[in-house]
Regions:
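Accessory "access/gating" subregions that flank catalytic or transport cores
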Residues: 1-41
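Generic recognition of flexible, low-complexity loop/linker segments
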Residues: 5-12, 50-54, 131-134, 171-174
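Glycine-rich phosphate/diphosphate-binding loops that line cofactor/substrate pockets in enzymes
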Residues: 14-17, 56-58, 173-181
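C-terminal catalytic subdomain
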Residues: 40-145
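Extended hydrophobic packing segments that form well-structured cores
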Residues: 131-203
């Protein structure tokens, strides 16, 4: 299974590094409705793209991501995440790993356990799994821009930058991080069940002229 996953996910002949990766984040994908609007789930989704694309990301790589980011937490599915998000804004919580000390408290909180058992919610410790993965986005990108957020403060509360348009985000990224001629990779089907990095990289490889 590891060999199959490795072949499915990575393109070992890819050599070009990308400075900017552009993709969209719909509301409903991966773990369910609200995946692209709940701020902690958003961080996991961003980090999933780091995991998939890390080997073709440059050391200064920036993500530019569209999301309505409208404050929809989907409390019925993840009843604990609003409390986790609010806690992350206080009490010396500077990075997501700082939240680790609350893992057992949330994992044993009776009301969240009851909702997990009887109301189709995720287990409360699942939030800590999401944060553990979510920290990768901060570690391996220079910046992440969320474009088109209706509640941009929610994104900023996770350390993300916000801009109204892709043009504004791109201009800011080039000025601060990548320089004027970045290599840009656009992933229009990122959240599709059939999305594979190798599809895009293969197409790019075919379309680019062979160098002597």
């Amino acid at each position: 299974s590891w060999k199959t996953a490795d072949k499915r996910t990575y393109v070992h002949w890819a050599e070009k590094k990308y400075d900017i990766i552009v993709f969209g984040m719909p509301t409903n994908f991966h773990y369910g409705n609200g995946m692209g609007t709940n701020p902690i789930q958003m961080m996991q989704a961003l980090s999933a793209q780091v995991i998939r694309h890390r080997r073709i990301m440059s050391d200064r790589c920036v993500f530019i991501v569209s999301s309505i980011c409208d404050g929809y937490f989907h409390d019925e599915r993840w009843p604990y995440l609003r409390e986790l998000y609010d806690l992350f804004q206080h009490d010396y919580m500077n990075i997501l790993p700082d939240m680790n000390r609350y893992g057992e408290y949330f994992a044993t909180k009776e009301e969240y356990i009851r909702k997990y058992r009887f109301a189709n919610a995720f287990h409360p410790f699942h939030g800590f799994s999401m944060m553990s993965c979510g920290h990768l986005a901060e570690e391996h990108t220079s910046a992440i821009y969320i474009v088109g957020a209706r509640e941009p403060g929610i994104a900023r509360g996770m350390g993300l930058k916000t801009r109204a348009t892709f043009e504004e985000a791109l201009a800011d990224a080039m000025r601060k991080y990548t320089g004027p001629n970045p290599n840009i990779l656009a992933l229009p089907r990122t959240a599709s069940p059939r999305e594979l990095a190798e599809i895009y990289l293969s197409l790019i490889h075919i379309s680019e002229p062979t160098r002597p």
